[in-house]
Amino acid sequence: MIIRKFSSKDLDAVEEIEREAFKTPYPTSLILGFWSMYPNCFYVAEIDGRVVGYILGSMDWGNGHIISLAVKKECRGLGIGTALLKTLENYYFNIANCNYIVLEVRVSNVLARRFYYRMGYRDRKLLPKYYEDGEDAILMIKKKPNAKGPLIITLW
């Protein structure tokens, strides 16, 4: 498995994974918009030259923000999501010097929530009716080891 930065040639594969993974996939314009603003926060996982997963992030008020993480169904359970998340965490904590990483996850997405708990994320706040279909989200955070200073969240 190879983890590398996203490039425009990966767009079709990322969109396919996004559609497979989420009830309401992000539109192409949003994916490309985040990439243009945060090119260091978008990675793909490749196996045998095929994109099988991706992670997309941004940075807000000095925090890392995970926008989307998905792996092709037939490739789940192989450590791809973990490798992608660790890659983006490394960028946020060690290069961008963020003290916190935040993300939102559907209350009903128990598998994703368990994954993030295993990776050191904790529930911070319930976000009522966050998604277009009215489902609540949970705001989760991970603090950089030995980080000092408050968590500043403006979106929520």
Curated annotation (Swiss-Prot):
GO terms for cellular component: NatA complex. It is an enzyme of class 2 (transferase). Its main location: cytoplasm. Its EC number is 2.3.1.-. Residues 1-145 form the N-acetyltransferase domain. One of its GO terms (molecular function) is protein-N-terminal amino-acid acetyltransferase activity. It holds the Pfam family Acetyltransf_1. It comes from the Archaea. It is found in: Cytoplasm. Keywords: Acyltransferase, Cytoplasm, Transferase. Belongs to the acetyltransferase family. This is Uncharacterized N-acetyltransferase MJ1530. The lineage of its organism: Archaea, Methanobacteriati, Methanobacteriota, Methanomada group, Methanococci.
